[in-house]
A protein has these predicted regions:
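Collagenous Gly-X-Y triple-helix signature in extracellular proteins
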Residues: 1-185
Length: 185
């Protein structure tokens, strides 16, 4: 009989697929983007659903969104205390995933529906089940991605509750599943 066991160990050698505890959430390593860094994504959406913008617009993209500001506020960052977070290139400690990281550059992306990114799909996201996440108190949830849905001035791309992609109105409150970098010792 073959049995898979999950074990907890102390190590500084992080691998893709390793899981850590972040407050009352868990997060899984998705990539090792550089020397001494590991990129993690929460396995669940944050407890509170959030709007990308208070108004239904994708003007300014994720960089100028209300959600980006809220995601990097002390109110949210307090859940990540105890981790040695490293900033992304834009200085943020938390960010949303890009379409390419979740889905790769698939047919929908190549149709021109999605704001372009230069990201490769994370290995674990090749399995649809890994793109699906829940939010506390909800049986299913949709979640924001950074990319604009370019066929509508009011929408951004999302991961739907069954792991496929869509566009959704920016003023809707849905799931937020942050990615973050950790400095490895």
């Amino acid at each position: 009989m073959k049995i898979n066991r999950t074990m907890t160990i102390e190590t500084n050698e992080i691998q893709i697929g390793d899981r850590i505890q972040v407050g009352h959430y868990t997060a899984t390593c998705q990539a090792l983007p550089g020397e001494g860094l590991a990129l993690f994504l929460l396995d669940q959406y944050l407890d509170k659903a959030m709007q990308m913008n208070k108004r239904s617009t994708n003007k300014g993209g994720y960089q100028e969104s209300d959600l980006r500001e809220e995601l990097n506020s002390e109110k949210i960052l307090k859940d990540f205390t105890g981790l040695e977070l490293a900033p992304f290139d834009n200085g943020d400690l938390l960010r949303l995933p890009f379409y390419g990281e979740m889905f790769g550059h698939d047919d929908w992306y190549n149709s021109g529906a999605v704001e372009p990114d230069d990201c490769e799909q994370w290995p674990l996201m090749k399995e649809r089940a890994n793109r699906v996440a829940e939010r506390k108190g909800e049986s299913y949830e949709w979640g924001w991605l950074q990319n604009k849905y370019v066929r509508s001035a009011s929408a951004f791309c999302v991961v739907r509750y069954h792991g496929d992609a869509a566009g959704w109105v920016a003023s809707s409150s849905i799931g937020v599943r942050p990615a973050f970098l950790i400095k490895l010792s």
